């Protein structure tokens, strides 16, 4: 993929320097093309620098063969994306169109590039999920932007977290990628070019795509995703049948007001769905929110507090994981980090570990610590670390640590009691992995 991207970037540079682009040398005089920023279904976006003031910009290249819909600006035929960006030039929450150039092979669209910024997908992914106050701070801006676009008769048609960038300094949001955008009309649309998991059920069931109603649905999906760190639907079947299963599950504690707003946005019947104006006037959206500086400061303080708590409970966590390693393989698989139920699953397993009675484990642990001579804390830590380690590289590291421990300690006669306790501290799975390492050596 990297080779393909670099090849396409090289081809674009050849294109700008070739015979076919001599009539459009103005772009090369005004901008210096850099590396690729990203790509989507409608084009490729590159970094660029404006030569007159060294301002950072983004340049999107669209091939003529990939243009699905055309419009006219001053009598010249251009992709609909350029026309829609021009119509939204005064909308604060839309990425600003700076210039555009027509070349025989396609079009170059020059846009502002907020810096430093991150798209909402990466922002949510980096945080797992965001607080309700921060979600309100961002969602309110997005809803206002979508409403103002509609006021200018522009329908984006691809509202999702990847098409929203967040300024990390101010917290302001910008709606990007108008490749699927079109003129808003009252009648239904016969085509859909956006992301299917953000698409309303009426499109899958009846090929019915209504502009405003579909935008409201996408906003509901976006808000749910920002709070839960996951999309509400896995596939088209979920989208079309979720209303039969009752209210959507929430995996974090949220207020009744935001649940009410999401349920109104994700109403199955498009004609019963709330309007964009109703979203902006909803009590949850109108509720006063902290500033971006205060929100980010609270997030940093919370992370610091959580890391401190993790440090104090490190020993307890090691013992808990040792017990979990003794459980059947199915339970360990269900609690792997990175799974869909990571936040809820881990907290549930933690509470079960402390609340459920485990007489066998408890008696075994009592015998190990009171009746037998226990291994040293350093040896126990190395053993537990080896039992937790999923990869061969970390097993080597644990073994190396054990060898270093033996070097620093004076040689002692073998103690069968200590060896027995150490073996019990390590799971059978870890023993097999370590045996495999020794066999390779």
Curated annotation (Swiss-Prot):
Its EC number is 2.7.11.1. Residues 301-364 are annotated as: Disordered. ATP binds at residues 37-45, 60. One of its GO terms (cellular component) is cytoplasm. Residues 303-320 have a biased composition (Basic and acidic residues). The active site is at 158 (proton acceptor). CDD domains: STKc_PIM. The keyword Nucleotide-binding applies. It catalyses: L-seryl-[protein] + ATP = O-phospho-L-seryl-[protein] + ADP + H(+); L-threonyl-[protein] + ATP = O-phospho-L-threonyl-[protein] + ADP + H(+). Its cofactor is Mg(2+). Keywords: ATP-binding, Kinase, Magnesium, Neurogenesis, Nucleotide-binding, Serine/threonine-protein kinase, Transferase. The keyword Transferase applies. GO terms for molecular function: ATP binding; protein serine kinase activity; protein serine/threonine kinase activity. SMART domains: S_TKc (SM00220). Residues 328-338 have a biased composition (Polar residues). Residues 31-285 form the Protein kinase domain. It comes from the Eukaryota. GO terms for biological process: negative regulation of apoptotic process; nervous system development; positive regulation of TORC1 signaling; regulation of mitotic cell cycle; regulation of synapse assembly. PANTHER family: SERINE/THREONINE-PROTEIN KINASE PIM, SERINE_THREONINE-PROTEIN KINASE PIM-1. Belongs to the protein kinase superfamily. Ser/Thr protein kinase family. PIM subfamily. Involved in the negative regulation of synaptic differentiation in PLM neurons. This is Serine/threonine-protein kinase prk-2. It comes from Caenorhabditis elegans. The lineage of its organism: Eukaryota, Metazoa, Ecdysozoa, Nematoda, Chromadorea.
């Amino acid at each position: 993929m990297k080779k393909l991207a670099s090849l396409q970037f090289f081809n674009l540079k050849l294109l700008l320097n070739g015979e076919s682009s001599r009539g459009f040398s103005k772009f090369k005089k005004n901008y210096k093309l850099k590396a690729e920023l990203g790509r989507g279904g409608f084009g490729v976006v590159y970094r660029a620098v404006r030569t007159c003031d060294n301002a950072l910009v983004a340049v999107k290249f669209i091939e003529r063969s990939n243009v699905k819909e055309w419009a006219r600006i001053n009598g010249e035929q251009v992709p609909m994306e350029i026309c829609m960006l021009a119509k939204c030039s005064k909308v604060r929450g839309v990425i600003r169109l700076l210039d555009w150039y027509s070349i025989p092979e396609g079009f170059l669209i020059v846009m502002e590039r907020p810096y430093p910024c991150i798209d909402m997908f990466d922002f949510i992914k980096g945080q797992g999920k965001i607080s309700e106050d921060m979600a309100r701070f961002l969602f309110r801006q997005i809803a206002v932007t979508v409403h103002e676009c509609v006021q200018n008769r522009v329908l984006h048609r691809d509202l999702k977290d990847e098409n929203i960038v967040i300024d990390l300094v101010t917290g302001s949001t910008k709606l990007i990628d108008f490749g699927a955008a079109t003129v808003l009309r009252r009648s239904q649309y016969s085509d859909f070019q956006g992301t299917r998991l953000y698409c309303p059920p009426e499109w899958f069931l009846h090929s019915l795509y209504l502009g405003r109603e579909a935008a409201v649905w996408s906003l509901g999906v976006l808000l749910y995703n920002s709070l839960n760190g996951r999309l509400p639907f896995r596939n088209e079947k979920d989208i079309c049948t979720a209303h039969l299963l009752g209210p959507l599950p929430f995996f974090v504690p949220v207020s009744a007001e935001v649940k009410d707003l999401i349920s109104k946005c994700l109403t199955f019947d498009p004609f019963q769905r709330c309007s964009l104006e109703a979203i902006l006037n909803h009590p949850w959206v109108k509720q006063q929110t902290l500033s971006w500086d205060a929100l980010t400061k609270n997030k940093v303080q919370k992370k610091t507090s959580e890391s401190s708590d993790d440090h104090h409970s490190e020993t307890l966590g090691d013992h808990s994981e040792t017990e979990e390693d003794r459980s059947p393989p199915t339970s360990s698989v269900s609690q792997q980090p990175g799974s869909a139920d990571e936040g809820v699953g881990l907290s549930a397993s933690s509470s079960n570990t402390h609340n459920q009675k485990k007489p066998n484990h408890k008696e075994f642990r009592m015998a190990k610590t009171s009746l037998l001579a226990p291994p040293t804390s350093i040896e126990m830590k190395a053993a537990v670390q080896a039992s937790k380690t999923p990869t061969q590289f970390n097993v080597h590291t644990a073994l190396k640590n054990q060898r270093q421990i033996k070097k620093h300690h004076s040689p002692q006669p073998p103690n069968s009691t200590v060896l027995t306790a150490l073996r019990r501290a390590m799971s059978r799975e870890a023993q097999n992995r370590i045996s495999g390492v020794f066999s390779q050596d």
